[in-house]
């Protein structure tokens, strides 16, 4: 059989002919074939878990058919995500592995880092909730072991801790190619330590992690309660710190709140700088969605990004997942994206989504309270800015948050034409993309209406 990369490129070319362009761009363009397994399975990487599941459900059969047409052999695709995205999603043994690790510092760096190419400082969106953590991470990357050592980053799931750790690793390696950088989770550290003891390779294990320039260890809270692992990490920490090697640690909570963590480890974690990351505000959430859309070559209307940003304020992972879901839904039903479609796509994962039973009068009353406009003025012919602009906001929200048709909305605003409603919606949508003060006002009104 021909080279697997060439084969997969041919498969993708055939896919372009058989699926819509949005579907191809959303699901297939970023895939890559890695290896053959047992001569009957082709291993294909997808960019994330959602894409992997979608590909399995919708494109497995078509993939097999195309491969059979091209080669005469029927292969079953197995869609996986890269190991650096999810360690437990281990690729099979037949998958080409990175070069063997060497214990000599400065060699085989890439084989140990397992860094995600997408997680760099350039792709990190800075906001009020992560500004200090970003600055500290950049300082550490620019001057390892001279700025803050250790650097301890904590925060909830999906807020960017891992992104910053990978960014530090990339920056160090870019500016010092001979540096030995290792990134791993504390769970992996624990598993490797257990295996090393079982296989009588404790010395090899210690050499591996005590002869590095930068150690990036994620989710340190998982070693809590594991006495032997804590003992080993304590000595690893000491060895690196004494040699002025940089240590960066992440957790879902500060050291003092990690239960069953030994006091001697807790005190060492507090030697350097402790910084937290909090959930992103509305402006940051919109910026994250824009950057994600740009990175994925997706054309997402502003109203859709605003809708998603208003609905999901927990973490970045859920925010980006919601965007992918909306894109997928739009591709599946072959309809253009708008706020109504986004609401439909996300109704199963957002239990408190904007209620469609809301009335236009409810919206007019609340907008009027915020802008000191009387209810009757929304229906009057007044065109002064103090009335016209709030009226346009109310029209925009009526379009976003109710099922009312354009003529119906127009009639509720003094019998105005549906084109007036369209103009108001377009105007406010554009302003929301750039006007932070307006974003805050509309968000406040939206949240009140949701309640």
Swiss-Prot record:
ATP binds at residues 158, 160-162. Keywords: ATP-binding, Cytoplasm, DNA replication, DNA-binding, Lipid-binding, Nucleotide-binding. Residues 94-113 are annotated as: Domain II. Residues 1-93 are annotated as: Domain I, interacts with DnaA modulators. Domain I is involved in oligomerization and binding regulators, domain II is flexibile and of varying length in different bacteria, domain III forms the AAA+ region, while domain IV binds dsDNA. Belongs to the DnaA family. Plays an essential role in the initiation and regulation of chromosomal replication. ATP-DnaA binds to the origin of replication (oriC) to initiate formation of the DNA replication initiation complex once per cell cycle. Binds the DnaA box (a 9 base pair repeat at the origin) and separates the double-stranded (ds)DNA. Forms a right-handed helical filament on oriC DNA; dsDNA binds to the exterior of the filament while single-stranded (ss)DNA is stabiized in the filament's interior. This is Chromosomal replication initiator protein DnaA. The gene is dnaA.
